[in-house]
């Protein structure tokens, strides 16, 4: 499948995978890509498969000359589902912001190398983390 930008989807998936453990290929559809990051374990006592994590997820959409994004912070529960919830621990929020900024920078650099822009979705108003200068 070729995306609106003219790039083959399979090649983009490979490039996105090389950015780190973020892309969820099974949740990517058509010209949309899904990334997430399980940044902070809520409680290490349960068995690994039953642990919950604070983290973020990002949806990326391929368009003609750019990719647009929207992201959320929240809880990745033991069933493997994301829920947007407020996070009150300063250290956790700082870690989430750091990992999101790091990923955003790598993603932006990759897209620039392909002569594509990375911009917030037109309807994405909630930008609690400053991602670009």
UniProtKB/Swiss-Prot annotation:
Spell out the residue ranges making up region: Essential for activity: 99-122
* Domain of life of the organism encoding this protein: Bacteria
According to its UniProt entry, the protein's GO biological process terms are:
positive regulation of DNA-templated transcription
Identify the InterPro entries for this entry.
Tscrpt_reg_Crl, Tscrpt_reg_Crl_sf
Q: Which parts of the chain are coiled coil? A: 90-111
Q: Where is it mainly found?
A: cytoplasm
Q: Which UniProt keywords apply?
A: Activator, Coiled coil, Cytoplasm, Transcription, Transcription regulation
Instruction: Identify one Gene Ontology CC term for this UniProt entry.
Output: cytoplasm
Q: Name one Pfam family in it.
A: Crl
Q: Where in the cell is it found?
A: Cytoplasm
Q: Which family does it belong to?
A: Belongs to the Crl family.
Give the function comment from the record.
Binds to the sigma-S subunit of RNA polymerase, activating expression of sigma-S-regulated genes. Stimulates RNA polymerase holoenzyme formation and may bind to several other sigma factors, such as sigma-70 and sigma-32.
Protein name as annotated: Sigma factor-binding protein Crl
What organism is recorded for this protein? Salmonella newport (strain SL254)
């Amino acid at each position: 499948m070729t995306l609106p930008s003219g790039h083959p989807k399979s090649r983009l998936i490979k490039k996105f995978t090389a950015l780190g453990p973020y892309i969820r290929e099974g949740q990517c559809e058509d010209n949309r890509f899904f990334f997430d990051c399980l940044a902070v374990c809520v409680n290490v006592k349960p068995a690994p498969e039953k642990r919950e994590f604070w983290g973020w997820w990002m949806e990326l959409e391929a368009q003609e000359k750019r990719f647009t994004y929207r992201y959320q912070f929240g809880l990745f529960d033991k069933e493997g589902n994301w829920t947007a919830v407020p996070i009150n621990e300063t250290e956790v929020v700082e870690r989430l912001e750091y990992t999101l900024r790091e990923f955003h920078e790598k993603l932006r650099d990759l897209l620039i190398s392909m002569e594509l822009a990375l911009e917030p979705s037109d309807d994405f108003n909630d930008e609690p983390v400053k991602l670009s200068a």
